[in-house]
Amino acid sequence: MGTLQGAALRSRERPSWPQETHGHRERTEEGCAVAAFSADALRTGGQELEQTGLRPKAGAPPMPDLLGHRICTDIGKGWRMDGGRTCSCSSFCRCPERGARRSSPDAPGLALDFPLLLDLLWHLCSWTSQPLEL
């Protein structure tokens, strides 16, 4: 059995339940905001970043230009050309000519290219002033 003094010491070491839930709520809201911002930036190809005046930090790698690359679209439709431009097969390109997998009508579901998404997330995080905590 502990003493009252020991219980008081333990209560000071650990935040109370309302403090813990408030901190969790703040972190969750912050994470949702980052996820929404990242999703918007992925949808628009980073164009709104330029419109809002945000600039990459000094020394940050450039944001890849994805508008000229093939991207996977709807379920079962595979690859499409964005804007009718041809693919330049840069290091960020995941077009079929570079061996990327296409979605198949036999395998329903969106074919996601996780290395490309991770590259984009890393670039987006390098543009922000604070690192993304996962």
From Swiss-Prot:
Induction: Down-regulated when the beta-APP42/beta-APP40 ratio is high, which is typical of Alzheimer's disease. Residues 10-30 have a biased composition (Basic and acidic residues). Residues 1-30 are annotated as: Disordered. This is Putative uncharacterized protein FAM30A. The gene is FAM30A.
